[in-house]
């Protein structure tokens, strides 16, 4: 919760005047001299009452580990707001308790504060900010704005904790294939985090990256910030997006990435689709690729971004995992699915994905493959049973993803 304490800063102006009555040219010359003295005295008094303000220190908002990072939140601000951002950034980097920035409105400082944390997932040691306004709270008012930073960790522990996080990050990044392109690196991080980090709303520090890199347990905030942190260390553009998500319109966080000239959405939290129960029990899906480099039409079916950031157009679906791997279906064709299932068994595959473009086609597939006997018929045709032999399979399915996965 932000704490706002308003104080009124009163400035006194001391006015000195010299009255010298008279007329005529000779007296006018004398008056001019006295007016000059008056101006000099007033100027000296003004300098005593209003000393020149010290320049508030600023950090370089464009500086990052590899010099290729683009602070998306910073770039979205006005010039005056960017200055506030740099002032706040400097205070955070110096571990200050109170950071002073130029006079501004409450709306400005709220926005700037949010943009700093949108751009910097590495600031794990801060939870929230409380504000103390000195002045009238307007952008052109006298005085300044003080932000009191709230730490979630003892300052003496920040550097050692940071070192632990960086060590884990470097170890994980070292496992990324050396020949991976930008998409390959994003895909690896997406898979790695989803397979090595559990989701638990009760875990400590779940709103920052400590939970991921030190404990491997987190929630959406940790997943999205860890994704941003790792990709940023590899020189890949990635920013944080917040909003709400289905099915209960809950607060959620995900990412926006850039490959070449195009933008895509990534939601590492939803890499596990939470498959429904099947005839064999609850199936745990290894990973869903629905939200790996997806376009807006895919994401907006389940996600609603807030208006904190201006978002670019995201219409390209060149990196749709299921299209790239030939498991995307624009309609349901039972004969086609039947032959794919039999071929999958003959080829000895471990799994077969079926990702559908629309809900109607997906529901037809569920009716045939989950509730019907389509898979059983395919197994009977493709598998040569010996005496007493059985053949088992599992199927997982997600209504939100419109995805079915058969495990042989």
Regions found by a protein language model. Name each.
Residues 1-9:
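Bacterial N-terminal signal peptides that target proteins for export
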Residues 19-22:
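C-terminal motif of bacterial Sec signal peptides marking the signal peptidase cleavage site
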Residues 24-178, 298-408:
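N-terminal accessory/pre-domain segments preceding catalytic cores
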Residues 156, 204-213, 218, 222-229:
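Conserved active-site-adjacent core of cysteine acyl-enzyme catalytic domains
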Residues 157-212:
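Secondary-structure boundary elements
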Residues 222-297:
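Hydrophobic/aromatic-rich core segments of domains that either
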